[in-house]
A protein has these predicted regions:
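Glycosyltransferase catalytic domains, chiefly GT-A lineage
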Residues: 3-152
Length: 152
């Protein structure tokens, strides 16, 4: 899909949390393990590509239902050293992992000892799909299936 920013982004500066980031919460799921199963089931990633990454997260103690972020729009305070650390580690995790930004960013935030509530929320009353400052054209192929299963 594609993202088009149609509203002022300045409004999101006040949303940035203590870690220096503000992100949309996932509109349906709150677990990277369920998300990994969904994207595999939908054919968006192969099991052989995501399984080692998920096994690593399990072995390190990443809890189920810890939270899940949608990474299509992120507000960042580039003067915040924590934000820079998270972004650098996220890049490496993404580069060396299954190329699923939602899984790797959520893991990196958890691995650094932060809680989901330390990350600012873009559109606190909703999510990316109902944010009036964003037009999000998702690929129609998977959209119906993605919204069916919450994984609870």
């Amino acid at each position: 899909g594609s993202i088009q920013l149609v509203g002022p982004m300045r409004q999101y500066l006040s949303c940035i949390g203590e870690v220096g980031l503000a992100i949309h919460r996932h509109r349906i799921r709150k677990c990277i393990y369920v998300e990994s199963m969904m994207v595999n089931w939908l054919g968006m990633i192969k099991k052989k590509d995501v399984l080692p990454q998920i096994q690593k997260y399990v072995s390190e103690g990443m809890p189920r239902n810890w939270g899940l972020f949608e990474c299509c729009v992120i507000a960042v305070d580039l003067s915040n050293k924590l934000a820079i650390k998270i972004l650098e580690e996220w890049f490496l995790e993404f580069k060396n992992g299954a190329k699923r930004d939602q899984l790797s960013l959520t893991y990196i935030i958890w691995k650094n000892g932060f809680k989901p509530n330390t990350i600012g929320v873009l559109n606190p009353k909703g999510n990316v799909s109902n944010n009036s400052s964003i037009i999000w054209e998702r690929g129609k192929k998977h959209m119906n299936e993605l919204t069916k299963y919450k994984g609870e």
